[in-house]
Swiss-Prot record:
InterPro entries, per the entry: Ald_DH/histidinol_DH, Ald_DH_C, Ald_DH_CS_CYS, Ald_DH_CS_GLU, Ald_DH_N, Aldehyde_DH_dom
Native source organism of the sequence: Danio rerio (Zebrafish)
Protein name listed in UniProt: 4-trimethylaminobutyraldehyde dehydrogenase B
Membrane-spanning parts: none
Keyword NADP: no
Similarity field: Belongs to the aldehyde dehydrogenase family.
């Protein structure tokens, strides 16, 4: 595959791959390698006048590295490199693109433990979850490698032997803007469909979790992708705005909060750019009295405490039918108290640290506000200090279950994005449907019941894009993920995502003479 020439300003340090020093526990790693990546290599901005800000390890609260943020010149360099890569990549057949993607998936599997450890160190989630996130990233790339080989259009026969056909074509340079809760997975979920369709991508991770996206960039390059196919630029709001407003960018895909999503949509509209928005949620989980209680409790825990509760699709409004509330609460509180909190790099840990001190404080304030508004704390909701002294400054809290919640409480109306479960009671199906849909958000919803007719009837009437029956937070890459209402536009994963990373061209072919009115 032809390599494109890339010019870097003098003083930039370039290298393709830096092996990480492996660590056995939290608090032992310092990252000194550059975290920006374009022109097929890491880019050091130390000789460029650019901002630098600290990145913290959530498990210990110590500084993990310093982030060099990208300004206008750096963003432009990355986009220009992506534009050059696009011209090469779009001309390859679907099979040729698939080979590169499958090799990237193989390299991810080979480096699974290393990537998972880096995700834990930068994000704070448990190593058990991080491994599953890396697996999801790999599976998404494998899935869309298959889609790359089957991209096709439609043939339409017209009168007189004439015909028309359609063809799917890439946009060009796509921008991906990731969230801090699934850094590596989101980078893969956004890049896989983009490059399968023949696009290139410039990806901006959250400044809180900048470390692992650059590993994916290295992996794509090692797999045989042209330099510039997947680039990483670091920074915050200013860098994101530069990307969204860049005239050479044709598509923006964002995962994050509703307010930021609205700003991105507004910026993209100035250039009439396509957007995919995966935004917030305040999702309902409905548990009927005929449910298998054991599975319902498991589902409620999965719907609230994965990744320390920092999951946009979490079912944080848990509606439980009145007759089974005592049994449900007894069991869910018992299991919540038993959740192992501590060093996220230890296999026995089930809940690690929240992503930042500011976010931890915000979640704890929500718990205090819930108590002030009349909710009852059945367990948790307090700062937690693990026994290991090196973790004393980490961002930990005990998972919280709130009872006596009502629909008008702040904890029920606003997305907390932490390990806080709000339990509400209901009596009838019609009542719970009305209350469950009383939200501007519609990302996800779930129902637990043994009545198959009721299950499908309730799901049909729930205003949410990603729904679950007798399970929760299951996101196989083969099926689309995304929301209704203010929770977003477009979908991640599944075959339909191809439509959000490509544009349709119609070609009409005349086989006879031209009829003219003139």
């Amino acid at each position: 595959m032809a390599l494109m020439r890339c010019l870097l300003p003098p003083g930039f340090y370039r290298t393709l791959y830096h092996p990480w020093t492996r660590c056995a526990s939290s608090g032992t790693l310092q990252i000194k390698d550059p975290l920006n990546f374009w022109c097929g290599a890491r880019v050091d901005l130390k000789d460029v006048k650019t901002k630098s800000e600290p990145v913290f390890e959530p498990a210990t609260g110590r500084v993990l590295c310093r982030l060099q943020t990208c300004g206008s010149a750096e963003v432009d360099a990355a986009v220009r490199n992506a534009s050059a890569a696009f011209k090469v990549w779009r001309k390859l057949s679907g099979m040729e693109r698939a080979r590169v993607m499958l090799e990237a998936a193989r390299l991810i599997e080979k480096r699974r433990e290393e990537i998972a450890e880096m995700e834990v160190i930068n994000n704070g989630k448990s190593i058990t979850e991080a491994r599953l996130d890396v697996d999801s990233a790999r599976l998404s790339i494998e899935y869309f490698a298959g889609q790359a080989t089957t991209l096709s259009g439609q043939h339409v026969q017209l009168p007189g032997g004439s015909f028309a056909y359609t063809r799917r074509e890439p946009f060009g340079v796509c921008v991906g803007i990731g969230a801090w809760n699934y850094p590596f997975q989101i980078a893969a979920w956004k890049s896989a469909p983009a490059i399968a369709c023949g696009n290139s991508m410039v990806f901006k991770p959250s400044p809180l979790t900048p470390v692992t996206a650059v590993l994916l960039a290295e992996i794509y390059r090692q797999a045989g992708a042209p330099e510039g196919l997947f680039n990483v630029v670091q920074g915050g709001q200013e860098t994101g705005s530069l990307l969204c407003l860049h005239p050479s960018v044709e598509k923006v895909s964002f995962t994050g909060s509703v307010p930021t999503g609205k700003k991105i949509m507004e910026m993209a509209s100035r250039g009439v750019k396509a957007v995919t928005l995966e935004l917030g949620g305040k999702s309902p989980l409905i548990i009927f009295e005929d449910t298998d209680l054991e599975n319902a409790v498991r589902g409620a825990l999965m719907a609230n405490f994965l990744s320390q509760g920092q999951v946009c699709s979490n079912g944080t409004r848990v509606f439980v039918q009145s007759s089974i509330v005592p049994q449900f609460l007894k069991e869910v509180v018992r299991r919540t108290k038993a959740i192992s909190i501590g060093d996220p790099l230890l296999d026995e840990t089930r809940m690690g640290a929240l992503v930042s001190k500011a976010h931890l404080d915000k979640v704890l304030r929500y718990v205090e506000q819930a108590k002030n508004e009349g909710a009852q704390v059945l367990c948790g909701g307090e700062p937690f200090s693990p026994a290991d002294p090196k973790l004393k400054d980490g961002y930990y809290m005990t998972p919280c279950v709130l009872d006596s919640c009502t629909d008008d409480m702040t904890c029920v109306k606003e997305e907390i994005f932490g390990p806080v479960m709000s339990v509400l009671t209901f009596d009838t199906e019609d009542e719970v449907l009305r209350r469950a849909n009383d939200s501007d958000l519609g990302l996800a919803a779930g129902v637990f019941t043994k009545d198959v007719k009721r299950a499908h009837r309730v799901i049909e009437n729930l205003q949410a894009g990603s729904c679950f029956i007798n399970n929760y937070n299951i996101t196989p890459v083969e099926v689309p993920f995304g929301g209704f209402k203010a929770s977003g536009i477009g979908r991640e994963n599944g075959q339909v995502t191809i439509e959000f990373y490509s544009q349709l061209k119609t070609v009409v072919v005349e086989m006879g003479d031209v009829d003219s009115l003139f």
